[in-house]
Amino acid sequence: MIATPKIIRAVADLVGTPAYLYNQKVIEEDVYDARAFERVFGEERFTLRYAMKANSLEALLRLFNNLGLHIDSSDGNEVWRAERADIELSHVLLTCQILPPQEELADYITRGMNPNAGHLDHLEQIAAAGGKDITVRINFGEGSGGTPKTTTGGYGSSFGMWHTEIPEILERSRALGLRVVRLHSHIGSGSDPQVWKRNVRIMLEHADAFPDVHTLNLGGGFKRSRWHDEKTMDMEECARDAYEVFEAYQERSGRRLRIEIEPGTYLIARGGILIGRVHHFRHKHDPDNGIDYNHTITDIGMTENARVCMYGARHHLTLVPEDDGREMTSTFVVGPACESGDALTVRKNDPNRLRRERMRTPTRGDLIVQHDTGAYCDSMAPHDYNSHGEAPAVLLKPDGELVVITYRGTREQLVQHEVKYSPTPSLAL
């Protein structure tokens, strides 16, 4: 638990429920862990980027910037948000499927942003926008993620140029006056450490083809445990393994390459929780099969954390307080949306199969906490569904102060992009 019951109640009193709470101290601890690469490679040879798609809130971007991290962005709008948080564009790498419009791309490049070409057509677009020194994302055939939906390498992935296209990448780049200075590869989120290590070796095998490359960006996807049968990736072990192969490459080639990584989940997942409230507890008994069905209905669900219904992700749930003498029970826990898939308790990687959560018997008004929701929850929230609106966010500072960093979305904000227009029926019904 990253916050005491007293703090959780204070957040609920401050902004209501549902609400996100982020613990600054925990986030800083996880940044320190990721800097194992810096301690192994040396500060001058390593860059830690934050994959801002994991959570793009301005206060959190500012925290990572103040901690000295650079940014991995996945859309032109993310570049805009990073700059809005006073992050220098020279610290931003843009890796996306579809590049921004040429005028916008040219403006970003002129002011120092680093463009990453993930498709052959990107090379022409970047050159037309005035790009010179570029990154290229290459799919070297290795893919590994916590689920098929989070695997971003291998034959089944659309991300990055395929490794057999390297000769064409080089030919086009030279013809366009582009200099490839960084190689990038990202194999997936929640990846297997052994596959990640193998991909590092494959990247170095191909580095000889790019004489101007000075940096290898090894991507992100470092596993952060959210469940008792999951294992957090050992960053120091990965760093030491990478260092050995980088040193061997230097001895063979004479090139001393820099290294970058761009974690998102690893840096912020553990540092966030979602605070909700129990509204109903229902019990049903199936006499034909002798099975009890308990359902706990809360005000947190898919509109605050879509990972559960998208991936079959598992997040621990606890009531506050955890133990007040009430009997234990097994219950399905669901959200408030008018959607059967809005469940908080599902089987591993299978959102279509529910599981029961063991907890003390909930009662109306209890606070409930969903853990490890710092990453890919707020940023992926389909809050327009059922017109629920956005949940607010609070930051717990190391000195114990609670700071509201986003307000609850209003009804007016739900419709602010809509045009008042009343179509005339075309059929007489």
Segment roles from a protein language model:
Residues 61, 84, 104-107, 126-130, ...:
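Short acidic, glycine/serine/threonine-rich loops at helix termini
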Residues 1-132, 136, 156, 167, ...:
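A charged N-terminal "starter" segment
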Residues 140-286, 386-388:
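Active-site loop/helix belt of alpha/beta enzymes
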Residues 129, 205, 211-213, 237-240, ...:
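Acidic/histidine-enriched ion/cofactor-binding microenvironments in catalytic or ligand-binding pockets
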Residues 25-26, 51-57, 76-77, 97-99, ...:
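Active-site beta-loop-alpha junctions enriched in small/polar residues
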